[in-house]
Amino acid sequence: MDRRAAAVADLERRIGHTFADRKLLELALTHASVGDGAKKAGDNEVLEFIGDRVLGLLAAEALAERFPKAKEGELAPRLNALVSRETCARVARGAEMGPALRLSASSSKIGGRETDSILAGAAEALMAALYRDGGLELARRVFLDLWAGEFDLANQGKPRDPKTALQEWAQSQGKPLPTYAVKDRKGPDHAPMFTVQVTVVGLDPVFAEGRSRQEAEKAAAKALLEREGAGI
C-alpha cells in the first residue's frame, strides 16, 4: 500500500465510515490542480459546492438545538464561524486530510496540502461525499464529531476581518495602507480560483488563493499577519 492509499484508509478509520462508492471518495479528495495526465476523471469542485450547503444545514441545525432560545441575529455569526474557510481548513488538518489529497505535482511541491483554500474545499467535498454515500444521518454524525471542538470557538462570535486587521497593523507600524493585486485567475467561470498578492511597504509580498477576489485578499492578509507574528 502506497503512502497516499494508507492516508486514505486512515481517514476512513478516523471518520468511522468505509465508502461503498470508492469513486465518490476519490473524487472528493481530488483537487482541480490535478491534470489530465494524472488520469483524472474529475475533481472535487462540484462536491465542494454541494458540501458547502450540506455543512450549512448541519451547522444551522446543531446551533438551533444548542441554543433554542437564541434569535437569528445571535445564531448567524456563530454559523458563519462554523462554516468559515478558516474553520473548515482547521477541521481538515485535525482529520489529517492533507496526506490523502490528490494534487498536481506543482501544487504539492509548494505546500498545497497545507493551504487553507485546498483543505477547506476538501472538507466541504468530504461532507457532500458522505451525504451521497450514506445519507444525511451519516453526514450529521461525522460533522458533529469533526466539528465538536469548533462550537466553543464559534460562541466567541465573528473574528475580525483580516484585511481590516492588516490595515490597522500597517498603520500602527507607520506604514502606508496595504495594496492588493490579482496575479492569476484560473478555472471555469462557475468555479474560478484567484491568486492575489498583498504588499506592505518594506515587507516581502504574500500570495494566496481564493474562490473570489475578496476571499483571496482576506487569505493573503491573514497569511501576512501570521508571518509577521501579528495574527488576528
Swiss-Prot record:
Its EC number is 3.1.26.3. GO terms for biological process: mRNA processing; regulation of gene expression; rRNA processing; tRNA processing. It catalyses: Endonucleolytic cleavage to 5'-phosphomonoester. Keywords: Cytoplasm, Endonuclease, Hydrolase, Magnesium, Metal-binding, mRNA processing, Nuclease, RNA-binding, rRNA processing, rRNA-binding, tRNA processing. Belongs to the ribonuclease III family. PANTHER family: RIBONUCLEASE 3, RIBONUCLEASE III. Homodimer. This is Ribonuclease 3. It comes from Caulobacter sp. (strain K31).
